[in-house]
Amino acid sequence: MRILIILSIILCSLFARADLEYVDNDIYNYNGGRNENGCLEVYDPYEKFNRKVFAFNSVLDYIILRPLAIGYKNITNDYVKARVNSFVSNVDTPLTAVNYGLQLNYDKTMKSVWRFLINTTLGIGGLFDVAGKVGLPSERQTFGSTLAHYGVAPGPYLVLPIIGSTNARDMTDSVITNYALNPLMYYTHNDFDLGVLAVSKINDRYVVLPFSDYVMKNSTDPYVAIRSALHRAREASVQYPENFKCPKPKN
């Protein structure tokens, strides 16, 4: 049983990205210009390799992960989906608190702690977002967010087997973010942790289902569309130091 759960978690990483919370038609138009931080919108020196891995991952997603997301969509109503989304967000909150602490942002650290305590108690284990109604909105910080805070650029775009799309800065997030820096992992049973992680990834895949389906059906180059969209969404979610400029990649 544990092996099946672990396999589900790995497969759910192919397309699941919480950064893509909405779909905008403009997001599909790849533009290799420079963003407000001075970074190349996408630096992809390993595109030939990445495209091969992308094709491999896409097959696995179509055969296994996408059907799971569709099944989740069909068997649950909006109320259940909202509860799952709230629960998943609450589980991530201690990690956000830790990363804000590493960024020396003590105000947001304490707000994240209070958000977790309120939702875990009054929100019945995080099923209801009580804290959001009293001025403590949901925020998500990963170790990659912390590295960006201290001036680490995204680096080369990468598509890794099974893991999926990432970049040099964020590629360790799946291990460091989900395990090493999340306090809950040290106080809960392994089976519970794996179950929560599996539910989280399936929920993430469901969230991006409209986006991925649209791209696969309408884009002339799904690789470029997904690369551009994921990079833009991720860069929009991090905060670099004031006056920070990403280094120009070497030719």
Curated annotation (Swiss-Prot):
A Pfam cross-reference name: MlaA
One GO process term, biological-process aspect: intermembrane phospholipid transfer
Signal peptide: 1-18
InterPro entries: MlaA
Keyword Cell cycle: no
Keywords associated with the record: Signal
The keyword DNA-binding is assigned to this record: no
GO cellular component: membrane
Similarity remark: Belongs to the MlaA family.
Name of the protein: Uncharacterized protein RF_0076
Highest classification ranks of the organism: Bacteria, Pseudomonadati, Pseudomonadota, Alphaproteobacteria, Rickettsiales
